[in-house]
Amino acid sequence: MSQPRPLLSPPETEEQLLAQAQQLSGYTLGELAALAGLVTPENLKRDKGWIGVLLEIWLGASAGSKPEQDFAALGVELKTIPVDSLGRPLETTFVCVAPLTGNSGVTWETSHVRHKLKRVLWIPVEGERSIPLAKRRVGSPLLWSPNEEEDRQLREDWEELMDMIVLGQIERITARHGEYLQIRPKAANAKALTEAIGARGERILTLPRGFYLKKNFTSALLARHFLIQ
């Protein structure tokens, strides 16, 4: 079987994207890095986004860190998801930065969260720390859109969390709020502050926040599609 090659330009169809992702299934991160001419870091401590970058190279992703989807022409977002030996997610999944000001008139339908989760290419990757990074294998991809029930679940959480932000309760939000979608601080250091609305409607400075999918949501999603027991 011939070795796969990274896509040199963004895929033109979902079928092309999925076919390329399927070719990567079973390869280790070290093998894919070597084929792409990259060096595999020893661990992810200083290169937290390295796996995502590697797979973006292989799949011809275009967005980088821009707010649009990774495959903007197709409206598809790429999400790598570290899993254990049973295929269960090991951590929450970052969706996007949570807007803390300027939220008047924003609805679920027009929200950045929904835009990012409208169509997702999930790629599970072995994530157990006992496996050296270079030896971790890439799993079968899944091209997914939320069904009615998933959309309703996410919408309810989003509305609850956004109400708290708009009403000046940002400092009261914990990772426990929201059944499937959570908000928590997203900053490499505690000095990176951003503006938000305070309890009395005043402007305050707080840590940037991000929206994350909880493991119970991604776990059910993967189990349903891959028939994990």
Curated annotation (Swiss-Prot):
One GO MF term attached to the UniProt entry: endonuclease activity
Membrane-spanning ranges: none
CDD domains according to UniProt: MutH-like (cd00583)
Pfam families named in the record: MutH (PF02976)
Keyword Cytoplasm: yes
Keyword field: Cytoplasm, DNA damage, DNA repair, Endonuclease, Hydrolase, Nuclease
GO biological process, one term: DNA modification
Subcellular location: Cytoplasm
Any one cellular-component term (Gene Ontology): cytoplasm
Keyword Hydrolase: yes
SMART domains: MutH (SM00927)
Family the entry assigns: Belongs to the MutH family.
Function: Sequence-specific endonuclease that cleaves unmethylated GATC sequences. It is involved in DNA mismatch repair.
Protein name, per record: DNA mismatch repair protein MutH
Species of the source: Escherichia coli O6:H1 (strain CFT073 / ATCC 700928 / UPEC)
Gene that this polypeptide is encoded by: mutH
